Amino acid sequence: MHKFICTWGAILALGVTFPAAAHDRARTPVRVPDLPGFVTLKCDFHTHTVFSDGKVWPDIRAEEAWREGLDAIAITDHIEHQPHKNDLPTAHNRSYEIARGHGEALQLLVIPGSEITRSMPPGHLNAIFLQDARKLDVPDWREAVAEARRQGAFIFYNHPGWRGQQPDGRARWYPEHDELLAKDQLHGVEVVNEREYYPEAHAWCLEKNLTMLSNSDIHNPIGLDYDLHLGDRRPLTLAFARERSRQAIREALFARRTVVLAGNRLVGREEHVRPLFERSLRILTPQVRIRGTGRAYVQIHNESDIPYQLRITGSDPDLAFPQELRLPAGRVALLEVRGRGKDREGRRMVQVSCQVTNVLVRPETPLAATLEFEVTLSPQP
């Protein structure tokens, strides 16, 4: 018994060998292809800390993002809403300063920002790439926005369908937003905030030439809102930048080179989502052979972390395809192709028309795409 106790005590002393005692500080990359001439940066431009109504210290925001595979975050604590002011002094720049220090150690880009928090209209606006957030702490919301623009900020309309200001959950555009747009004081809209997708905001971005954004608006520790260990992920803005830098992200935002990645859905302009989809896939068997009414399998490798759901819309006089095809993230899927006749022969290229149902180029409008491969048909003996 004494020997057992001693042995067990020695094991406990080396508790690092137990999985429950181990805690890896490790990064999980988000695999998304780059576009020609650009690097795809994974960003979250709406986060909060204890310096407004968030629940975590600013450096935690930086490490959370680094662990999740992000390239950049903006710290956007509220200007007007300071529920912790009895415990922490109001210091509008301090959360960014703290987060940036840890971000630099992790090679994570941290961007200074603030949330201008007013009643509707105009509602809540994020201003990022600020020089001094303290100057936005003024009574008149118009002056706060004007000051942000004088500092060179990129300004966007937050959660336009948030039920705290829109009880029916419907996003609305007001004359005040037209006013800001005319003054070059509004540049984008959150098409997704947390887990909410706003189709109205998606349409505004196309109609009014605004940048599409997708952000977490995180207040809690990230693990309380997202089941990271199950593959759950915060919403991200994919920014197509010329290089990995704050200035390049700013340029990409003003140029509207973004795509929304939220859950398993992509939302964006066709010029961006099409190459993103196409560069995610690699056909491993570009040539197949079919005898008569036999079958062949086209192997398609989805090299990204974005699963795709395809609805086959095209038809072929010689070949039959399934109605739907799923391309799981990081895996190889099979497209089954069957011959329609026993006596068909020849070799030709086949283009299978489809809709990528979880990639939206407009509200309720999926991306139209094609899968291409070569087939050789021979008669059935």
Residues covered by each model-derived region:
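Sec/Tat signal peptide C-region and signal peptidase I cleavage site
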Residues: F18-A22
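Charged catalytic cores and adjacent phosphate/nucleic-acid-binding surfaces used
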Residues: H2, H23-C43, A62, M120-Q131, ...
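Hydrophobic alpha-helical membrane context
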Residues: L14-G15, P58-I60, P89, H229, ...
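Bacterial N-terminal signal peptides
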Residues: T7-T17
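Short gly/pro/ser/thr-enriched loop/turn and capping motifs at secondary-structure boundaries
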Residues: E80-H81, R163-G164, H219-I222
